[in-house]
Design a protein with these regions (language model features):
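ATP/NTP phosphate-donor binding region
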Residues: 1-57
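Glycine/threonine-rich beta-strand-loop-alpha-helix active-site module
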Residues: 41-105
Length: 105
């Protein structure tokens, strides 16, 4: 799953990443709801999207907030929870979903 902002899809930045992943033979889904200083709801919606689509990897394309959103989605998926709020006080979570970050800032 590519985790990004709608604007980066519109500008063609994230679409280049999607195209490269598809060219490599991967099936790519896009979650483009990331925003600056995202509320926990954005992460939780990403978790639902990823879980419904059986996502096994995340590529976060964007700035710090987008990368943080991707990492938060990874955390909830890996730990088996339903919301990021469940993990505010977890010191060392176990990560089962693979994540790659591509900073654009």
């Amino acid at each position: 799953m590519v985790c990004t902002e709608k604007a980066l899809m519109d500008f063609g930045i994230a679409t280049q990443v999607v195209a490269a992943l598809e060219e490599a033979g991967l099936t790519v889904l896009v979650y483009d709801k990331c925003v600056a200083d995202a509320p926990s709801r954005i992460c939780d919606e990403g978790v639902v999207f990823a879980r419904e689509n059986k996502v096994d990897g995340i590529v976060a394309v964007g700035g710090g907030s987008t990368i943080d959103t991707g990492k938060a989605i990874d955390l909830v998926l890996s730990m088996g929870g339903t919301t990021i709020a469940d993990y505010y006080h977890v010191a060392e979570p176990e990560h089962k979903v693979k994540i790659i970050a591509i900073p654009t800032t």
